[in-house]
Amino acid sequence: MRKVLVVDGTFLKSKYKGVLLVATALDGNSNLYPIAFAVVDSENDRSWNWFFRQLKVVVPDERALAFVSDRNNSLCKGLENVYPLSQHGICIHHLLNNVVTHYRGKGVVGLIAKASKAYRVVDFQKRFEAVCNISPAIGEYLTDANVTKWARCQFQGYRYDIRTTNPTESINSALRSPREYPVIPLLDSIREMLTRWFFERRTRSRKHTMPLTIAIEKKIDRRINKGKTFLVQPVNEHRFLVRGDTIDCLVDLDRRTCSCGKYDLLKIPCRHAIKAGLTVSRAPSSLTDFMYTTSNWRTAYEETINPIGVPDDSWVVPNTVRNASVLAPESRRGAGRRRKRRYETVEDKLRSSQGAQEKKRRRCSRCGEENHNRATCDRAI
């Protein structure tokens, strides 16, 4: 399991509103692995502090731990108070949306996205300098946002390939209907979802016979194909110079590093490391971090998520709970109909525009020509 937690909040749509706070990780097969849920009145300082204190009971604070979130002030304060040792990264989607909303600059969004994805510091610096040349104001804003929080190669810890809050967005999407339920049915729906996920993945991992998880095996196969034409020059027993890509790369198989940066940051051998390993009969699985192994994947789903087997009328409720005074949640209904679909991000718009350009042109079903349809066709048949 990668030690990266994605945290976010999403609005509930029941009578009393409120917010569902979520913390999730990704397993070795890149599937969602929810860690914690909480229902609170709103995303304020007290709510996030309380949530992180409960989370700390099962996920201790350490320097190897990383969080990825948006730039919500209360969330950031809660992390600083409860998880001072951990590293905090921000979602690149939210950062790009802020840039588009408040600044102008032709082509700057694509450059920022590429800079955030760079594995080498030199590549990041080239792209970031290009952004600053186009718009010094945007460069200043990105610097103030703290480069170490949004640029992968500048991050103080390891965030692997988790650059956005998409994992929590995916959970929110899976709970689209339950988010309209009252609290108890909502929590039971979450439990049912987790029970189903754990059973399906437990079954799937037990059937899988390869040393690495399904997603990583596919990734390794693609990299093997990309590196077929590379030339390997040994430096010593475990260091190799790999030529044939856009840059020559120095690979150290024992230290599990490559000068391209990808092996160092993802802990999965890059195509250069795979090619070097194959020349000395070292399988890619032996060069991959344990978190991506099938055995570790199976361990993650050994336990089961059990339903509550006691009928409601047989529950033993402690007097402290029975006598507690439960206040109505703080909520205000907004004007108009509540939006159910999430707002489209900048990268969503970029992808949709690219898809529109590649879309197949429509033809008239009568004559087969373009730029009109059957109803307006005046061609002679």
PLM feature segments, named:
Residues 1-34, 41, 45, 154-155:
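An active-site-proximal beta-strand-loop segment
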Residues 15, 37-60:
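Active-site beta-loop-alpha junctions of metal-dependent nucleic acid enzymes
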Residues 246-249, 339-358:
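Short, intrinsically disordered linker segments that flank or connect zinc-binding domains
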Residues 257-264, 362-372:
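Short Cys/His-rich zinc-binding micro-motifs
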Residues 270, 374-379:
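Cysteine-centered loop/knuckle micro-motif
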Residues 276-280, 364-367, 379-381:
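Short Cys/His-rich micro-motifs in 6-15 aa windows
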